[in-house]
């Protein structure tokens, strides 16, 4: 497990995302849960982002702690997310976690899939 807490982090975890995760964990009443972000093949642009809650941190996972909650990324996914930012938005279009990814050369209209 690798944990970094300075500006050299390969991926950022915004306050908005951390605050939302904290609220969801309080609803679940399980402080052991962490937000895991991952990349899989699929979607209309070749790769897609996924988000899930996970109690486990695997060997080699990258973790960031903010607002008392953790974001976890597996090593394979991290290579596609370096320089990116995990954020949360809520508005007229709904509420969702999303990734701002500078490595994505194209994205689909909803922002859930990308290509590099």
Swiss-Prot record:
GO terms for cellular component: cytosol. It holds the Pfam family Fe-S_biosyn. Its cofactor is iron-sulfur cluster. Gene3D superfamilies: HesB-like domain (2.60.300.12). Keywords: Iron, Iron-sulfur, Metal-binding. Iron-sulfur cluster binds at residues 44, 108, 110. Binds 1 iron-sulfur cluster per subunit. One of its GO terms (biological process) is iron-sulfur cluster assembly. The keyword Iron applies. One of its GO terms (molecular function) is iron ion binding. PROSITE patterns: HESB. Belongs to the HesB/IscA family. Homodimer. Required for insertion of 4Fe-4S clusters for at least IspG. This is Iron-sulfur cluster insertion protein ErpA. It comes from Shewanella frigidimarina (strain NCIMB 400). The gene is erpA.
């Amino acid at each position: 497990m690798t944990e970094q807490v300075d500006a050299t982090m390969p991926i950022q975890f915004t306050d908005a995302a951390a605050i939302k995760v904290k609220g969801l964990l309080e609803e679940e009443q399980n402080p052991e849960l962490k937000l895991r972000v991952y990349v899989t093949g699929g979607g209309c642009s070749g790769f897609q982002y996924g988000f899930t809650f996970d109690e486990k941190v695997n060997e080699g996972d990258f973790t960031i702690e903010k607002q008392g909650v953790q974001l976890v990324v597996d090593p394979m996914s991290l290579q596609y997310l370096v320089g990116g930012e995990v954020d949360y938005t809520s508005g007229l279009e709904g509420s969702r976690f999303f990734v701002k990814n500078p490595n994505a050369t194209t994205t689909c209209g909803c922002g859930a899939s990308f290509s590099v």
